[in-house]
Amino acid sequence: MNQEIMNLFNPTTPAQVFDQIRISIASPEKILSWSYGEIKKPETINYRTFKPERDGLFCARIFGPIKDYECLCGKYKRMKYKGIICEKCSVEVTLSRVRRERMGHIELAAPVAHIWFLKSLPSRIGLLLDMTLKDLERILYFEYYVVLEPGLTALKDRQLLSEEEYLKAQDEYGQDSFTAMIGAEAIRELLRGLDLEKLEAQLRADMAETDSDIKHKKFAKRLKIVEAFRNSGNKPEWMIMTVVPVIPPDLRPLVPLDGGRFATSDLNDLYRRVINRNNRLKRLMELRAPDIIIRNEKRMLQEAVDALFDNGRRGRVITGANKRPLKSLADMLKGKQGRFRQNLLGKRVDYSGRSVIVVGPELKLHQCGLPKKMALELFKPFIYSRLDAKGLSTTVKQAKKLVEKERPEVWDILDEVIREHPVLLNRAPTLHRLGIQAFEPTLIEGKAIQLHPLVCAAFNADFDGDQMAVHVPLSLEAQLEARVLMMSTNNILHPANGQPIIVPSQDIVLGLYYLSIMREGLAGEGKVYGEMAEIEHALYSKVIHLHTKIKYRWHGVGEDGKPVTKWYETTAGRVMLGQVLPNHPKIPFDAINKLMTKREISGVIDQVYRHCGQKETVIFCDRIMALGFHNAFKAGISFGKDDMVVPQGKWKVVDDTRSMAKEFEQQYNDGLITQGEKYNKVVDAWSKATEKIADEMMKEISSVKKTTKGNEAQINSIYMMAHSGARGSPAQMRQLAGMRGLMAKPSGEIIETPIISNFKEGLSVLEYFNSTHGARKGLADTALKTANSGYLTRRLVDVAQDCIINASDCGTNLGIKMRAIVDAGTVVASLGSRILGRTACEDIREPSTNNVIVPRGTLMEESHVDAIQRAGVQEVKIRSALTCELVNGICAMCYGRDLARGTPVNHGEAVGVIAAQSIGEPGTQLTMRTFHIGGAAQINEQSFVESNFDGKVTIRNRGIATNSEGASVAMVRNMVVAIVDADGTERVTHRVQYGARMRVDEGDTIKRGQRIAEWDPYTRPILTEVEGTIGFEDLVEGQSISETLDESTGIAKRVVIDWRSTGRGADLRPAIVVKGKDGKVLKLQRGGDARYMLSVDAILSVDIGSQVKPGDILARISTESAKTRDITGGLPRVAELFEARRPKDAAIIAETAGTIRFGRDYKNKRRISIEPTDKTEEPREYLIPKGKHIHLQDGDIVEKGDFIVEGNPAPHDILAIKGIEELAAYLVNEIQEVYRLQGVLINDKHIEVIVRQMLQKVEVTDQGDTDMISGEQVDKIEFDQNNDKAKEEGKKPATGTPVLLGITKASLQTRSFFSAASFQETTRVLTEAAVNGKVDPLEGLKENVIVGRLIPAGTGASMAKIREVAMKRDKLIQDEREKQAAITPAAPEAEPLALPPAE
């Protein structure tokens, strides 16, 4: 008996252990097997007794009792009758919980089509039957008959007949000579009659025969679905339903409200409609009603079932009493409020609270201040148990009373409970994993949570009213994880870039900066001190100042651990700072013996972390914080309006620029330049002026003044704040005291008239009006882009969520090549910074001696990187996530260093999610940061390259001409200038623009900062290569060229117009030719005539008969006027790259190396072909829309991958032409460019992880002897498995090409249908999965969260491993026992196996 009572409290139903979940279409038999009874009446509950009606939607006989262990009529109550069925009300006596589990069903009087398989595109029923959706609907909704069996009549199989045609055919051929049906029964018969095997063979044969691409695609689609039905065991006729399942009543509750009204789930309404119509149809059939009435009723039944499954997918939306659309079963799953995202992936949490945060500068880094009231509530159960253990209360009720009265002993116990019990703090929005961290609570008075100032950067928190949530980890495992993995002291480095994120900011920085200033000529300069105590004494007695230059004997540690001393010239303040430095040989006093800006402090923290470890770093950070706050308070820095110094030369610069602008205006009036060029030049001049004034202002503010006594005065406090990195930026200072500069219109164009005043002088009304544009745009952008960025993060997380470190080494020899990124002649990302923390893919050798510096397979630390850079290595091949050959996840060697820990990455690390967060988080940060500069225009147009090394110039593909002005001009498109140092190592290479003026030539020596070449960034020239006289071809006034008079100037300039639009000039080919003395067109060296084709909008620079020399400009094409670039261009750009969208006017890329030839024009396109250098290849032809500027001439030589037409290349083209490595390099660089503009650091490996996920699919080009269909996209893994199988069987394997998918598409095509369904397009994903009978292997994170298991990452990964080992061991034991049993037949029965514990 006792045993039975015990069983009551822990029910014996074991948690199900499963490894995979399969989804398929439910057959009518299956639905009946789930059901506990048929629902015959639409009634729900009796409004007087509130008891469910029998056979109704809430029937207790079918679904179970309403109260635990009590039948409906009350005859049997309590436990002892468990399992008895009451004879009066037929209700089983059991737990009421079964009302959440038991299903019912409705027997339909006529079959109906399942709307998902009918309407969800592509229509599965339509594909199988090869009928259009329109025809299907006509049959289903009783408009047309379909011929099933034409017999000997002239009718065709599956011919549609209208009512009249049907009757006519019956009259003509007789009633039994053919079979035609209408409605879902007809479709069901058609589906049942399909012979899938025959159909598959037929389709394969058709595919082999057809030449048409469209037909091939259609057959492939049908073949795919036929195979899906064959392989999954689903029967096509199951897509037509004869039984509708009814979900358990507690999942669609009906709750009585006061006042006799009821709140009900919409599903009840939808089920009621179905039951009503079904019953009516049954009655009509029994009454033998006329066909037309029955048909109408059947149609209405079909509509009712449609609405139940997916309301609004077909016809009008069914609305409830209050005109609100009813939520159907599909809506329950879909969207943010659907089951997946609302309840499975995001759950509400108990044991949590939230409050406003305030700063807690006296806390240690691992602490947070928790209000007593909050702690008392959150830790209640712990307090109760402790009170009980101490004998202070005997019952829970008593304990509750004690706690409610807040007795003194309760506070003591709360202290005990809280000690060493971490809590989690979270600030929304949680953009990356540092948005939730664990702290040890300390109890405080008041009602606000206290937060340590140094973790604010990680949470992106400030104290202007932000709120934070507190969560309590309950189980011991959870507390352990919180302490070991999530404690704030364990998260010192940023997972996105490996830099410290626990970095002082604002006041702390200002205090440390003030502390480290050194000023000449203060009292006590040059005194010598040996101990800190002496310095303190001197400071106290005002013998020296904090900033006085003194000499100091520093006591440090040598490499061997013995104490060493050294003399330094420093200041008292810096010595105070030196006292908090850890004692370590690698961290000398020099580390802080300089002016400490924010960046310097960050560097010191990084050094301390690398050399002294985490504990020391945390202590150092806390000390440095206290020191900073204290000194900021001691310094008492403030500023007034006179601290904003307007530079003296401001008005001179403004007047000069004004006169320049006037000059440009004049040039425009004289017709020398176009409107666009004038605009560009004016904008350029004003932005240069703004820069100049800003520089002068900075010079003046930062200059050190002398006081009357001859010593240095205090530095300007605004400059201190900006220079230290505490607050403000040079851009803001420029607006305060320089000149506000150019403003942008909301469209992104720049207004030509700048704002000359600054905020100190005040703006005029017009200036103020102009500046409102920028401010308004900034605020609007912020709101929009926060949402966009959040969505980008969601897509990234979704595509990468199953990327986990699953092995230590995949053993691949592949890798990608890394070199420094150089932009406009400056190194923006050094080689060292790009390879740090990555694994070398091959031995790295010193170029001069060929000695191995770093052997392959080494994880590169700082020391290795230094050695590589010292040796002058230009290119390093490293392992990458892109080339990792692991089937599931990524291996640790290919990933490299875990950036947040600075150590090799651990097994089970969810690198995909970290990558997604690292890329998404700054997106939101940046989007919120656009309007800080008030829309002040910042233009960056590159117009020169300069050397950043000393060395010698060598030129590859040299082509330089001297034009009639005597200037050297670059005449070829692929000229590369390389700078070689004294050892002959190539330090850097620059590609020179066509038409650039060269400042150096082959063999010149060059100094750092010297210009190599210059060009006009706003125009593209067309140059002549020969000397001679100009002639025009097909340049006909009014047809292909027009003298446009500029209205405002009255000056004519000649512009090529679109000659095809003028009707008469369709066959013209406008060109400029260069003729010799004999009047014939000259020949070029490379072959072909000196004929230069012109494109639309080219502006002529020469006239007929003028003499030209090589390098002279014949015509120029103006490029677009400058637009401002801020992350607005940025975020959509990043999304565009990750979505792999084709850019609007994509570049056209040469698919092969060869010679350009112009062919005959085609309608309104120009035809260009490439004659390949490799004669075995076919020539390639490109049609280029008119108006696109082709900057190549007939006979130019191009390399594979060169641009024929400028623009942004489509990533798919790069993949097809240049391969995966080039594509990855392109995507990484483009995405990094956007973030770099904003000064955001993201490690390349994060972007590589996402790109890897975008390259998971292969398009089958030739199916070989495999089951795959050519033209279909399959998973890489699947593709390889199929090919391995084919090779084993000696068949011909398939070939395929990698396909690049955008992140949304890639997410929807993952192997897990759970993950895809919870992302987007739920209906479509589930329909497809059901038809295919897909199995979800539950490998990713999302799927496991959805089914409620531990995720296979982090600590969950080790659990999964243990489980795997246990399973294997059990299998071995079982096999052993079976062997034994086979040998000894009469052995006693084996005891039951020890199964691994269920999760």
UniProtKB/Swiss-Prot annotation:
HAMAP family: RNApol_bact_RpoC. The gene is rpoC. The RNAP catalytic core consists of 2 alpha, 1 beta, 1 beta' and 1 omega subunit. When a sigma factor is associated with the core the holoenzyme is formed, which can initiate transcription. GO terms for molecular function: DNA binding; DNA-directed RNA polymerase activity; magnesium ion binding; zinc ion binding. Gene3D superfamilies: 1.10.132.30, 1.10.150.390, 1.10.1790.20, 1.10.40.90, 2.40.40.20, 2.40.50.100, RNA polymerase II, clamp domain (4.10.860.120), RNA polymerase Rpb1, domain 3 (1.10.274.100). This is DNA-directed RNA polymerase subunit beta'. Its EC number is 2.7.7.6. Zn(2+) 1 binds at residues 71, 73, 86, 89. Binds 1 Mg(2+) ion per subunit. It comes from Afipia carboxidovorans (strain ATCC 49405 / DSM 1227 / KCTC 32145 / OM5). The keyword Lipid metabolism does not apply.
